[in-house]
């Protein structure tokens, strides 16, 4: 074990667990991590992140496990920080304050119980609040940056900061936290009071749309490719017009319900999924001259 990693583990005083990451991703694909860390509260998370900065340790923050593809051909040799226990949610009038690991279903339920509108667009997704902020989650014409108020995070110097953010600080699927050694801890959302029945109807409508698109039939990472306004069409439509629905490699297939979903239909490997993503990109480029950009993150690949 490298000296820096050994020092890191001594500083955090949390015993790493051995976990199969396939059990923590929506693709149901992954390999063993022997450095799986589960902070039980924000204080423990702060200690982990600050120790990682001090020792220059690469980490991966794992939330709901969507939008990622973990290499299943090799053991993951860097610490995985699982945020599943960082899930506290508080209500303050029309504001929700959630820890980074708060899942969408719990957030939406609490919002509905308190007649608060603004989270309907994420209902039915498997992600967490921290991941949603990191990637500026977007669907049905709404994005998380529209309802953001404050974010508490650790910067690359190990300082805990609470800062207000505006929608203009974010772009399509881009946040100020990407490509930076920052760690999101808590998020404050600014919601609006509305009729409870109307909120519930919107939530159910959005979930039904996901059911109709086959989102829950097979394991997947969610949308595979970002949309690009310059293409004048959603990526899923472009893939469908290239007649790529049903295209398969190994156990991976382009969903027959939605062109932008690559699904694990029959014990797919990470190589199957990655190869199919590359095949779809190549075919679309060959037929249209358009270069699709992945939304999925590759973890543990060289």
Swiss-Prot record:
Cellular component terms per the entry's GO annotation: cytosol
Catalytic reaction list: UDP-N-acetyl-alpha-D-muramate + NADP(+) = UDP-N-acetyl-3-O-(1-carboxyvinyl)-alpha-D-glucosamine + NADPH + H(+)
Keywords: Cell cycle, Cell division, Cell shape, Cell wall biogenesis/degradation, Cytoplasm, FAD, Flavoprotein, NADP, Oxidoreductase, Peptidoglycan synthesis
The protein's annotated pathway: Cell wall biogenesis; peptidoglycan biosynthesis
Cofactor: FAD
One of the record's GO molecular function terms: UDP-N-acetylmuramate dehydrogenase activity
Cellular location(s): Cytoplasm
Residues in FAD-binding PCMH-type domain copies: 28-194
GO biological process, one term: peptidoglycan biosynthetic process
UniProt keyword GTP-binding, yes or no: no
EC number: 1.3.1.98
Residue numbers annotated as active site: 223, 295
Main subcellular location: cytoplasm
Similarity annotation: Belongs to the MurB family.
Alphabetized PANTHER family for the sequence: UDP-N-ACETYLENOLPYRUVOYLGLUCOSAMINE REDUCTASE (PTHR21071:SF4)
HAMAP family linked to this entry: MurB
Functional note: Cell wall formation.
Protein name: UDP-N-acetylenolpyruvoylglucosamine reductase
